[in-house]
Amino acid sequence: MEVATVPRTRRLLKEEDMTKIEFETSEEVDVTPTFDTMGLREDLLRGIYAYGFEKPSAIQQRAIKQIIKGRDVIAQSQSGTGKTATFCVSVLQCLDIQVRETQALILAPTRELAGQIQKVLLALGDYMNVQCHSCIGGTNVGEDIRKLDYGQHVVAGTPGRVFDMIRRRSLRTRAIKMLVLDEADEMLNKGFKEQIYDVYRYLPPATQVCLISATLPHEILEMTNKFMTDPIRILVKRDELTLEGIKQFFVAVEREEWKFDTLCDLYDTLTITQAVIFCNTKRKVDWLTEKMREANFTVSSMHGDMPQKERESIMKEFRSGASRVLISTDVWARGLDVPQVSLIINYDLPNNRELYIHRIGRSGRYGRKGVAINFVKNDDIRILRDIEQYYSTQIDEMPMNVADLI
C-alpha cells in the first residue's frame, strides 16, 4: 500500500539554486492564536500566565500544537521571538509527572543556554511539581549523578556531559519520548555533530525529535533526514531573518590597533543601557578586558575557558545591571536573554555569517530597538558585504549621533 505523503508547499528548484534554498512552512500547520486554545493542562497554563506570557508569539502559535501532537518538527524562528518557551511548553505538556524518570532531553550548545532552559522549564512548570536538571560540563559530576538518581522528568544539557551521564548509566534513556536540539545550526556544526549522534544512538527508536534554531543552512537540513521522520517544517524565509528594529552600522578602521581607540571613544555611548562586545578568540577577550581596565574603563568579560562558577556570577552581575559592558566570545551569542542589551559591538567580525545574526539578535529582543556596530578593517570589507547580501540587509557607516539611536 502506498503511504500518503504529507502535503508541503511546493518548491521548484534548479540544481544551481540549491544555495538559495528557502523552505516554506508545511501546509498543514495551523495557527493557534491563544494559549487557552492549545489544549494545554491547567497547571501548565497557570505557569505560563504567572511567567508573564499573555499571547503566544508567531512561532508558539504554529509549533506548540504540532510538537504536542507528537510530530517531528523543524522550527526556525528569529532570536528573541520566544523559541525557548515554544519547546519548554511542549515538553511540559507531554510529561507524565507521576513517573519520576527522564522523559525529555534538551541539548544546547553552551552551558549558559542549558542553564537558562532549565530555569524557564522550572518557572513554567512551577505548578506541576516538575523535576528538571541542567547537566553541563564544568560542574561537579557527583552532583549530576545524585540529581539524576533522584529522578528528573527533563534533562537540559550540553552534549558532552549528557553523553557521559548516559554512558555511566546515571541518565537512563528508556523513558525518553522527546529529544530537542536548541540552536541546532550550532549544535550540528562540526563540533557537536558526533556527540549528538552518540546521544541519539542511546535513545528509544520512537523518540520524537524537535530541532530549533534561528538559522538553518541547507547542509543542516540535509542532516535532519538521518534522524527525523517526516518532519513538519515551520520556517521563515532567510531574507526575513535580519532582525527588524536593529540598526546596523560599521566603522572603518585601517589597522587592528585603531579598534581599541575607537572603542574608548564609544565608551560613554556603551553605558547608556548595556552593551556586549564580541571578539573571536578567548585570548582577545582577555587582552581587551585588561587594556580597557588599564584605561580606567569598567568592563566585565566572559568566555568558555572560565570556571562555571565564575561565568555564572558574571552573568548574574550583568543581568542585574551591576555591570554595563560585557566583553565575550561567541559563547554568549546563543540564546541568552538580557532585555536591557541594546547595543552590540563586533570588535571582530564573526567567522561565519550564521553567527552574525546570533550576535546582533542579542539586542532588540521581542521587537525592542537595538544598534549593532561592526569594526571593519580593510580586509573585512568583503566579509561585511557577504553578510549584507546573505541577509538582504544594509549596513551603513556609523553616524556621529549614534548615541541618539540607542
Swiss-Prot record:
Protein family membership: Belongs to the DEAD box helicase family. eIF4A subfamily.
UniProt domain Helicase C-terminal: residue ranges: 245-406
Compartments reported by the entry: Nucleus; Nucleus speckle; Cytoplasm
Example GO BP: regulation of translation
Gene3D superfamilies: P-loop containing nucleotide triphosphate hydrolases
Gene it is expressed from: eif4a3
CDD domains in the record: DEADc_EIF4AIII_DDX48, SF2_C_DEAD
Gene Ontology cellular-component annotations: cytoplasm; nuclear speck; nucleus; U2-type catalytic step 1 spliceosome
Keywords on record: ATP-binding, Cytoplasm, Helicase, Hydrolase, mRNA processing, mRNA splicing, mRNA transport, Nonsense-mediated mRNA decay, Nucleotide-binding, Nucleus, RNA-binding, Spliceosome, Translation regulation, Transport
Motif Q motif in this chain: 33-61
Sequence motif DEAD box, location on chain: 182-185
Domain of life: Eukaryota
Subunit and partners: Identified in the spliceosome C complex. Part of the mRNA splicing-dependent exon junction complex (EJC) complex; the core complex contains casc3, eif4a3, magoh and rbm8a.
Listed EC numbers: 3.6.4.13
Catalytic activity: ATP + H2O = ADP + phosphate + H(+)
Pfam families: DEAD, Helicase_C
Listed PANTHER family: ATP-DEPENDENT RNA HELICASE DBP3
Molecular function GO terms recorded: ATP binding; ATP hydrolysis activity; RNA binding; RNA helicase activity
Domain Helicase ATP-binding per the UniProt entry, residue ranges: 64-234
Protein name: Eukaryotic initiation factor 4A-III
UniProt keyword Hydrolase present: yes
Binding residue positions for ATP: 55, 60, 77-85, 337, 362-366
Transmembrane annotation, as ranges: none
